[in-house]
């Protein structure tokens, strides 16, 4: 059934409680939005297969609770991850200020040095913005992260965030190939231009 799947990737979604991590995941996997979505208790987990530049990848996406009382789950949660989506709420500056704490945690527990990180400023559909787009971009550049602003409510930027993350992982030698070396898998020729396609207006590849 999965013969044409290039690889399976472990993706994490992290960030403060209430920034919309679960809503982003639900929009990406099920294309739905629930404004009354309850806070995640512990860890949620979803699987979705996507195609990027002609390469099919199965994503095992882990969504964690942002609350401090669930941090005991942290070490096993980070283990073996190839990509991380770090989310903040553009209408809550405190969630942006605390990004450094999440990066420190990532550095402490992540088992790979070449993990690909994507910074997502969520809830751009709201008017009471407290974090400017350029602030997010500057933070992402400082920490060598991909960056995008998105809205789980309107779907803006959501698909692009996951596609760009997966594309970057597939382009990173050693992140996924070792488990596939004996399967004879080959990359499809990737598109040379990062600026084209549906994501051109959103993502900054850093």
UniProtKB/Swiss-Prot annotation:
Q: Which PROSITE patterns match?
A: RAB
Lipid linkage positions (S-palmitoyl cysteine): 199
Q: Which InterPro entries match?
A: P-loop_NTPase (IPR027417), Rab (IPR050227), Sigma_54_int_dom_ATP-bd_1 (IPR025662), Small_GTP-bd (IPR005225), Small_GTPase (IPR001806)
- Annotated positions binding GTP: 17, 20-23, 34-35, 40, 66, 123, 125, 152
User: Which positions bear N-acetylmethionine?
Assistant: 1
Q: Where is it located?
A: Endoplasmic reticulum membrane; Golgi apparatus, cis-Golgi network membrane; Lipid droplet; Apical cell membrane
Q: What is its EC number?
A: 3.6.5.2
Gene Ontology biological-process entries: brain development; endoplasmic reticulum tubular network organization; eye development; import into nucleus; intracellular protein transport; lipid droplet organization
Instruction: Show where the record puts the motif Switch 1.
Output: 31-45
Per UniProt, activity regulation is: Regulated by guanine nucleotide exchange factors (GEFs) which promote the exchange of bound GDP for free GTP. Regulated by GTPase activating proteins (GAPs) which increase the GTP hydrolysis activity at the ER membrane. Inhibited by GDP dissociation inhibitors (GDIs) which prevent Rab-GDP dissociation.
Give Gene Ontology CC terms: apical plasma membrane; cis-Golgi network membrane; endomembrane system; endoplasmic reticulum membrane; endoplasmic reticulum tubular network; Golgi apparatus; lipid droplet; synapse
Q: How does it assemble?
A: Interacts (in GTP-bound form) with ZFYVE1. Interacts with ZW10 and this interaction is enhanced in the presence of ZFYVE1. Interacts with BSCL2.
Q: What does this protein do?
A: The small GTPases Rab are key regulators of intracellular membrane trafficking, from the formation of transport vesicles to their fusion with membranes. Rabs cycle between an inactive GDP-bound form and an active GTP-bound form that is able to recruit to membranes different sets of downstream effectors directly responsible for vesicle formation, movement, tethering and fusion. RAB18 is required for the localization of ZFYVE1 to lipid droplets and for its function in mediating the formation of endoplasmic reticulum-lipid droplets (ER-LD) contacts.
Name used for this protein in its record: Ras-related protein Rab-18
Its organism's taxonomic lineage begins at: Eukaryota, Metazoa, Chordata, Craniata, Vertebrata
């Amino acid at each position: 059934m999965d013969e044409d799947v290039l690889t399976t990737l472990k993706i994490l979604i992290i960030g403060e409680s209430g920034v919309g991590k679960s809503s982003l995941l639900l929009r990406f996997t099920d294309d739905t939005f629930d404004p009354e979505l309850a806070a995640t208790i512990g860890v949620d987990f979803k699987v979705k297969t996507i195609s990027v530049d002609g390469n099919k990848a199965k994503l095992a996406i882990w969504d964690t609770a942002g609350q401090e009382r669930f941090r005991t789950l942290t070490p096993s949660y980070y283990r073996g991850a190839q990509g991380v989506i770090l989310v903040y709420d553009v209408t809550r500056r405190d969630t942006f200020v605390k990004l450094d704490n999440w990066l420190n945690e990532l550095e402490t527990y992540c088992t790979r040095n070449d993990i690909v990180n994507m910074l997502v400023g969520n809830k751009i559909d709201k008017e009471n913005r407290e974090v400017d787009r350029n602030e997010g971009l500057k933070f992402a550049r400082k920490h060598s992260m991909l960056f995008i602003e998105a809205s789980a409510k309107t779907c803006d930027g959501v698909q692009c965030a996951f596609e760009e993350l997966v594309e970057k992982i597939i382009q990173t030698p050693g992140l996924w190939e070792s488990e596939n070396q004996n399967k004879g898998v080959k990359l499809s020729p990737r598109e040379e231009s990062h600026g084209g396609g549906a994501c051109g207006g959103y993502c900054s590849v850093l």
